[in-house]
């Protein structure tokens, strides 16, 4: 399960606004704001999945190890990065 911090960090790596990510993920801006909230508000699992897929399509890789969670940007030949 991706975390609010991972989503915010991924968006920063892509230089995307919340509006851009919401549009790419086909979720409402309100749903995305709930997902990114530091208080870890409850969100629909479908929202989480759609956001993760949109970020992965743009080249984000989600990392989860015993040492913690994170993200990294991998440039893919066919990745479309909007700004």
Residue ranges and their predicted role:
Residues 7-20, 76, 81:
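Short basic helix-loop element that most often maps to the first helix and adjoining turn
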Residues 16-34:
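Short alpha-helical DNA-recognition segment
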Residues 1-12, 63:
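A short, Lys/Arg-rich alpha-helix, primarily the initiator
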Residues 28, 38-39, 58:
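The DNA-recognition helices of helix-turn-helix-type DNA-binding domains
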Residues 45-62:
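DNA major-groove recognition helix of helix-turn-helix/homeodomain DNA-binding modules
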Residues 60-83:
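Helix-turn-helix/homeodomain-like alpha-helical modules used for DNA recognition
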Residues 1, 42-45, 65:
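Non-catalytic, surface-exposed connector residues within folded enzymatic/regulatory domains
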């Amino acid at each position: 399960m991706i975390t609010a911090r991972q989503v915010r960090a991924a968006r920063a790596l892509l230089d995307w606004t919340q509006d851009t990510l919401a549009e790419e993920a086909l979720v409402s801006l309100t749903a995305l704001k709930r997902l990114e909230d530091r208080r870890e508000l409850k969100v629909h699992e479908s929202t989480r999945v759609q956001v993760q897929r949109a970020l992965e399509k743009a080249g984000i890789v989600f990392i989860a190890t015993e040492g913690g969670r994170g993200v990294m940007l991998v440039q893919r030949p066919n990745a479309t990065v909007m700004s």
